[in-house]
């Protein structure tokens, strides 16, 4: 998957200020870095708007005695789960894109930035999804998780029986195999859980026979948070999984870029009867 013309308006200025050739720095990396910085600046402004948990809609009313209930909306609700030290504001553009294309039941879950355990956060997600199903009358949901949010959702699906509720899990830049980036951050317990060969990562590698959820992982070839880059891929013999490589953007752009949002919508709208377990690969070029 390739995103085209991501930061073209800014590039001429960069090319004037920087040497013509910068050793070891490709044009694609330069464009992705400029975009990441622009997104970071914008997200700092939006961050306060997402601190408070969003208001929930009313519960689905029970049908009157002797009446036939109306059929539930064909498309299941979508749950958005942010990454480490972030909040629901990161999904403002994705949420708008989903709503514009018929996904009106979209909810975000804020978990505390002080969360120190992925398992605890996964239990919170499970309770949240049960509440959504009760309110909407839907049996299943789709989940989109960015970075740590994807790992929390995967733990819920794989280890807490969440495959009963989650139809499709889309992860964006999630360290499924752990990441070695920022070694000085090991003081935080949840960062240690995201390291390769951590107890939690090894737990996710255990057998998961009969898992009913379909997994789609978007991973970027310019993701500065994934070390190695392929750690954002799902490799598990028991899981029905697809890995989609995104070329040309970095970690922060994954939940915000229109081309990625379009691909997420296609993934969620695809019916997959009889999918077999095992990882599949694909690609999306965005720059």
Please give the residue ranges for each predicted region:
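Flexible, membrane-associating and regulatory peripheral segments of lipid-active enzymes
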Residues: 1-78, 92-93, 101, 270, ...
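Serine-dependent carboxylesterase/thioesterase catalytic core
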Residues: 78-89, 95-212, 217-219, 225, ...
